[in-house]
Design a protein with these regions (language model features):
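Nucleotide/pyrophosphate-binding catalytic subdomain
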Residues: 1-138
Length: 140
């Protein structure tokens, strides 16, 4: 692997990068990407570039993303007021449809942007992968 062709010119020294590649080459790197960051397209594009570099370096990543600001905006468009208990959104059937739609949209944006950079990426979400099961809570 020719690191000079993968890494940004203004990036860290090659010996530093090599040390971390060796350290994490067999690990799964989990990245939490907040919904606030998704609002700024320049930050988003930088994030996609960084993920693409990690992929080209042979590092395995999983992105867990949010969508809070856009969820809030979509709920407001529908005149729906969210209720929060201890920082957690109380979600009924109508709200979950909006939340799910927003998150799947963000998910697709991330995956498609990575693929456009030549990076292998797959999407995992509730509509296609049955990754989440929920139960109604009577008391929190």
């Amino acid at each position: 692997m020719n690191l000079e062709n993968i890494l940004p010119k203004d990036g860290p020294p090659l010996d530093e990068v090599t040390k971390y590649i060796e350290k994490y080459k067999n690990d799964l790197i989990v990245i939490k990407y907040g919904g606030n960051v998704l609002i700024d397209r320049n930050v988003f594009n930088n994030f996609i570039t960084d993920l693409s570099v990690l992929n080209k370096l042979g590092l395995a990543t999983v992105v867990i993303h949010g969508g809070g600001p856009r969820i809030k905006r979509e709920l407001e468009k529908s005149n729906i007021q969210s209720k929060f208990i201890r920082g957690l959104r109380v979600t009924d059937k109508h709200i979950i449809n909006i939340v799910e739609s927003v998150l799947i949209d963000f998910n697709s944006d991330i995956v498609n942007s990575l693929k456009n950079k030549g990076t292998s990426a797959i999407s995992l979400h509730t509509k296609r992968n049955n990754v989440i099961k929920t139960l109604s809570l009577i008391h929190i």
